[in-house]
Amino acid sequence: EASLRRTSHYDYWSNTVRRSILLDSKADILMYGMGENSILELAAKIKEIAKHSEDGFATSKEVAKIRGVRGTCYRTSKKEEIPSDAIFLPSYQEVSANTKEGKIAFAKSYIIQESNTDSISAKPLVEQTEERFLVQEPPSHPLPQEQYDKVMELPYTRRWHPMYDKPAANGKTGVPALEEVLFSLTSCRG
């Protein structure tokens, strides 16, 4: 869900454009897309930080300073932490304006984001919200076939989480949508 809310996004519940969830949350880093490579690289960087600390742990402040991991977003208020090749999106203030210009800015932002989804040619994206910047690193590279095959060969149970065994308010258990995809084949990810 964070992937869909990493930049300014339309919120159906409030019927407004909301700012990045990373700016509203207490998270240090947001990971988006297919995260296998990203999480391994991020874990290695955290492990390296922890190795040099007195207590063997990485602090939240140290983790929040990690940069350059594909498939992640971070926030900063320092312009010098923005990659030099970054593309600036229209700001949150522009895209959230409830005007014709605001809607055009939102559409422009979407087009820029959509044209930067290729892991080979994508550039970092930056969205300003007041004095802070959301920086989106380029997407993670796809897994090589051997690694992808290992992921697909994991012992998935095709079962819902045990918490859904408890009857809901309507007396039913399970996840009805699971029936539709129970015997589906993976043709793409994302």
Go through each PLM region and give its residues.
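Conserved active-site and cofactor/substrate-binding residues in soluble primary-metabolism enzymes
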Residues: 16-17, 37, 142, 146, ...
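Structured core elements
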Residues: 31, 135, 150, 182-187
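Extended surface/linker regions that mediate inter-domain or inter-protein docking
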Residues: 106-108, 112-154, 158-172
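Generic, well-ordered alpha-helical scaffold segments in large soluble proteins
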Residues: 42-46, 150, 154-158, 190
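Active-site proximal loops enriched in glycine and acidic residues that flank catalytic Cys/His/Asp
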Residues: 34, 155, 185-189
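N-terminal pre-triad scaffold of radical SAM enzymes
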Residues: 169-190
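A glycine-rich phosphate-binding loop feature that marks nucleotide/adenosyl-phosphate handling sites
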Residues: 68-76, 167-176
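Glycine-rich beta-alpha loop elements in corrinoid/cobalamin-binding modules
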Residues: 1-129, 136-137
